[in-house]
A protein has these predicted regions:
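Conserved PLP-anchoring active-site segment centered on the Schiff-base-forming lysine
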Residues: 155-174
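PLP-dependent enzyme catalytic core of the Aspartate aminotransferase-like
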Residues: 2-28, 96, 100-104, 108, ...
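Active-site phosphate-binding strand-loop segment of PLP-dependent enzymes
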Residues: 88, 188, 192-244
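N-terminal "arm"/small-domain region of PLP-dependent enzymes with the aminotransferase-like
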Residues: 4-6, 10-30, 37, 41-111, ...
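Active-site C-terminal subdomain of aminotransferase-like
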Residues: 238-241, 248, 253-360
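Conserved PLP-binding catalytic core of the aspartate aminotransferase-like
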Residues: 92, 335-345, 349-385, 395, ...
Length: 434
């Protein structure tokens, strides 16, 4: 009897502990249930990952521990290496002018706006940047997105339906392909830069309401330039629209950096221009569409990534305003990129390497073919102080692995020569060149 009385006194003291243990039991049971349900999926994923590794196409992520520049440091080493694989074409990613402009925007407009554009996410800075970009490209109007991927994803669905046709180059960027898949238009694909095939499709689709020819201005994996004059001529002949992505040309390609339309002599003949601020324009984030005022107004009403994504941060907008202002005040920035490009291409070709792409474009793919060879080649280049990456399937077609080098205005001629010297040493060591 006394024992029962003592137990009644002690029991309330253990009640909180019991509740804690019971709660932990429930959480563990829940976790075990999730693990069991996901085990089959994880097993299948691990098999897929093993297959990728066995094929030599698994993509490791090297960790950079410095600012993006011509010289960087990589995790695991304090030694600086030369970076020849960034989209930092104009060398502005670490520009003191852009950093200062971003700081000023932080002070004046804050860190973020916590809103989409049509609620309370549009500032005077956003409107100023849109005006600058439209002026830079010689277009009527511009609409900003969080990224060019969003700009491409939100364009076609808003404008075209089943009465229309979207006619796309077969090697267009993944973001373009995804954007086209989202729309209800009839979809056609022409062989890469094949104008006869494009004309065949234009002839077949003359009964449709609108036809839109869609192409990258410069193709990112090969560095080749779309034949925009021929495309525009066909568009005029068959009453079609022309849409281009200028991500790998705006700001640095063409005499004054106005991109592929300037390089090909078709300024004023392009209906829609999409591009990014994440490459030559400082390398941060942001994308856009330039078009007529009517098209841009419709995109503001119907483009889903624009309507349902947070507005671009003020610091990014402030830096971008500075970038476009600099480009419109001076045309000298692209000149250094071109000089570095010609030096690299001339020396590499003379050494016996096979390079893809246009002679004037800073994307200089060194073609190797085998995926495992491309990965090994890149690793040996890093040992020699040159940071490059091997590209293989599914980023590029099977059997067309390469090291995609990219020249920058941040590189000195001496650094470009060091890069070529390393390529020659590794190329001879691995039997790529004699």
């Amino acid at each position: 009897l006394h024992a029962l009385k003592d137990l009644n006194l002690i029991w309330p003291l253990f009640l909180p502990l019991f509740h804690c243990v019971y709660y932990l039991y429930l959480r563990m049971a829940e976790r075990l249930s999730i693990t069991k349900n996901g085990a089959k999926l994880n097993e299948a994923i691990n098999k897929t990952l093993d297959d990728i590794r066995a094929a030599g196409t698994f993509k490791e992520e090297r960790v950079i521990t410095s600012k993006q520049a011509a010289e960087i440091t990589v995790q695991g080493s304090d030694e600086k290496v030369l970076n020849f694989c960034a989209n930092n074409y104009l060398g502005l990613a670490n520009s003191p002018d852009l950093i200062e402009a971003a700081k000023e925007a932080l002070d004046s407009h804050g860190f973020g706006l916590a809103s989409v554009r049509f609620i309370c996410g549009t500032t005077d800075m956003h409107k100023e940047l849109e005006h600058l970009i439209a002026k830079f490209h010689g277009m009527e109007d511009c609409i900003l997105y969080s990224s060019c991927f969003d700009a491409n994803g939100g364009f076609f669905e808003a404008l075209f339906n089943a009465e229309d046709a979207v006619i796309s180059d077969q090697l267009n960027h993944a973001s373009i392909i995804d954007g086209i898949r989202l729309c209800k238009a009839q979809r056609y694909r022409y062989n890469h830069m094949d104008m006869e095939d494009l004309e065949r499709i234009l002839k077949e689709t003359q009964n449709l309401r609108y036809r839109c020819i869609v192409t990258d201005g410069v193709f990112s994996m090969d560095g080749d330039v779309a034949p925009l004059k021929e495309i525009c001529d066909l568009a005029d002949k068959y009453n079609a629209l022309v849409w281009i992505d200028e991500s790998h040309s705006a700001g640095f390609f063409g005499k004054t950096g106005r991109g592929t339309p300037e390089y090909c002599g078709v300024q004023g003949r392009i209906d829609f221009i999409n591009s990014t601020m994440g490459k030559a324009m400082g390398g941060a984030s942001g994308g856009y569409t330039c078009a007529s005022k009517e098209v841009v107004t419709l995109l503001r009403q119907k483009s889903r990534p624009y309507l349902f994504s947070n507005t671009l941060a003020p610091s990014l907008v402030g830096a971008a305003i500075k970038t476009y202002t600099m480009l419109m005040e001076s045309s000298t920035l692209p000149e250094k990129v071109l000089a570095n490009t010609h030096l690299f291409r001339d020396r590499m070709t003379a050494a016996g390497f096979k390079l893809a792409g246009a002679y004037d474009h800073p994307i200089c793919p060194v073609m190797l073919g085998d995926a495992a060879l491309a990965c090994k080649f890149a690793d040996k280049m890093l040992e020699k102080g040159i940071y490059v990456i091997g590209f293989s399937y599914p980023v590029v077609p099977q059997g067309k692995a390469r090291i995609r080098t990219q020249m920058s205005g941040a590189h000195t001629l001496e650094q470009v020569n060091r890069c070529v010297d390393a390529f020659i040493e590794v190329g001879k060591e691995l039997g790529v060149i004699a």
